[in-house]
Design a protein with these regions (language model features):
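Glycine-rich phosphate-binding "P-loop"
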Residues: 67-88, 207-224
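Extended, H/D-rich, highly charged conserved domains that either
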Residues: 9-67, 99-209, 219, 223
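Short, well-ordered amphipathic alpha-helices
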Residues: 88-97, 122, 258-265
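Short, hydrophobic/aromatic alpha-helical segments in well-folded domains
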Residues: 93-97, 117, 151, 230, ...
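Short secondary-structure boundary/capping segments
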Residues: 1-4, 123-132, 182-183, 261-263, ...
Length: 333
């Protein structure tokens, strides 16, 4: 909360805070469900002369806390993710991304971040003709333009776009309408102007993001199952393997993501394998001891043994932050 008060957003902080709140909510929700919907629970309520109304009020209050906290994050993101600031703080990253997107190569970008950083950059350097996030403009939500998640309709309307953005864990501008399961996005400025998070009726609408524990289970729901399916396809489908893999600012704490990356590395080591032409992992740790621990943690997460483990001298790791990836342009050329 201290960072939020200073107008700072760190996704790890956000995820850990929401995870703690979610854990309380899920435990309480499970208990209320037991009391209301199980024979044993109903008998217990009747025998003890108890009511679940107070517990349900606690559940509603927890939802309010989640939405209030998320609203603060949206406000910070909306105030900071602008082209001028991106160009000033991430010029190296933007230059590298622009070089990767030149020509007619197809590029899939997978992000675990909830913000709209990549959308902002891609709309500027690629434009709408070559870029898709699998949403199509359809109708409005309370007067604001609504963009439905619909990969099939996107393909029918626009054909195959060569630059594709996948929000593996959703984004703060994405919502699920509970009445029919419709997933849609709103513009960040509309969310802020309408104070949507603070005014949201959680019986009708809820943020479409993955946080907290059990991500491997949560990823089985739409739209996350679609995004993860495409990610895994690039890692394991012999007819659609990625040739280059750049991993920027990832903690290697999501088992389902690690498993897919591990499979791609195994394919590269096989007898008739297809190794990656380029494999880069970018992090920001400056202390050598922390760097060594990170390398060890990556090898553990990817289940790499003595013969296959990634080493510093392989040139895979860059520890000077995401903006320094621009150096790769010179190396490749």
């Amino acid at each position: 909360m201290e960072r939020i008060q200073k107008g700072q957003y760190v996704q790890v902080d956000f995820e850990e805070a929401i995870a703690s709140i979610e854990q309380v909510h899920d435990s309480l929700d499970s208990y209320v469900d037991f009391l209301l919907n199980k024979d044993e629970g109903r008998r217990y309520l009747e025998a003890e002369g108890l009511s679940v109304e107070e517990l349900q009020s606690h559940l509603n209050k927890i939802k309010e806390i989640i939405l209030s906290y998320t609203a603060s994050i949206v406000e910070i993101i909306d105030g900071n993710v602008h082209w001028d600031q991106i160009g000033e703080k991430l010029s190296g990253f933007v230059n590298w991304l622009q070089s990767e997107l030149q020509g007619q190569n197809e590029v899939d970008l997978f992000t675990l971040n909830f913000d709209l950083l990549l959308e902002t950059i891609l709309l500027r350097i690629v434009g709408t003709d070559d870029f898709t996030d699998f949403h199509v403009k359809r109708g409005t939500h309370e007067g604001s333009d609504k963009f439905n998640f619909d990969p099939q309709q996107t393909l029918l309307d626009f054909g195959v776009r060569r630059v594709r953005l996948h929000h593996l864990h959703g984004s703060l501008s994405s919502f699920k309408r509970l009445s029919d399961g419709r997933i849609f996005k709103l513009r960040a400025e509309d969310i802020r102007l309408d104070d949507l998070y603070k005014n949201m009726d959680t019986k009708e609408l809820f943020p479409s993001i993955i946080t907290g524990g059990f991500k491997s289970k949560k990823v089985q729901r739409l739209p996350f199952s679609y995004y993860y399916g495409k990610f895994k396809e690039k890692m394991v489908d012999p007819n659609n393997l990625c040739e280059e893999l750049y991993i920027l600012g990832y903690s290697f704490r999501d088992e389902h993501i690690n498993d897919a990356i591990s499979e791609r590395l195994k394919i590269g080591r096989g007898k008739n394998g297809v190794p990656l032409k380029r494999f880069v992992i970018v992090d920001y740790k400056t202390d050598e001891e922390q760097q060594e621990k990170f390398i060890h943690d990556v090898n553990t997460a990817l289940e790499l043994g003595k013969k296959t483990r990634l080493k510093r001298e392989d040139g895979i790791f860059i520890f000077t932050g995401v903006d320094s990836i621009e150096e790769i342009i010179q190396v490749k050329s």
